[in-house]
Amino acid sequence: MNKSILHTIIIYTLASCPYCIKAKALLDKKNVIYEEIEVSNFTQEEKEAFIKKSGGKNTVPQIFIDNMHVGGCDDLFNLEQDGRLDKLLETQPKNKNSLTVSGA
């Protein structure tokens, strides 16, 4: 199977956040590749950029699919409940590998 990434999924998290764990579990259940960015070590500049990118939200998780801000955990589960998450992910390669990136 070709493992080229057709969608970019990024989830900003904190290790101890139960909502982050829940959101990642749903993405894992969907068997998709995502990039996890741990925000605990962000510099002030990185925090400000994260908040701006998240539409003023400073909570985690914040989830992006192809640079589109999906929102937080509840938003992700609402997409799932409405049947829209699968449509967003349908061409995403099936692979449980995830990548964890820490702030600078």
Curated annotation (Swiss-Prot):
Question: In Gene Ontology terms, what is a biological process of this protein?
Answer: cellular response to oxidative stress
Every copy of the Glutaredoxin domain together lies at 1-96
Source species, domain of life: Bacteria
InterPro entries tied to this protein: GLR_AS, Glutaredoxin, Glutaredoxin_subgr, GRX_bact, Thioredoxin-like_sf
The record ties this protein, via PROSITE patterns, to:
GLUTAREDOXIN_1, GLUTAREDOXIN_2
Q: Which GO terms describe its molecular function?
A: glutathione disulfide oxidoreductase activity
As for subcellular location, the record says: Cytoplasm
Function description: Has a glutathione-disulfide oxidoreductase activity in the presence of NADPH and glutathione reductase. Reduces low molecular weight disulfides and proteins.
Q: What is this protein called?
A: Glutaredoxin 1
> What is the originating organism of this protein?
Rickettsia typhi (strain ATCC VR-144 / Wilmington)
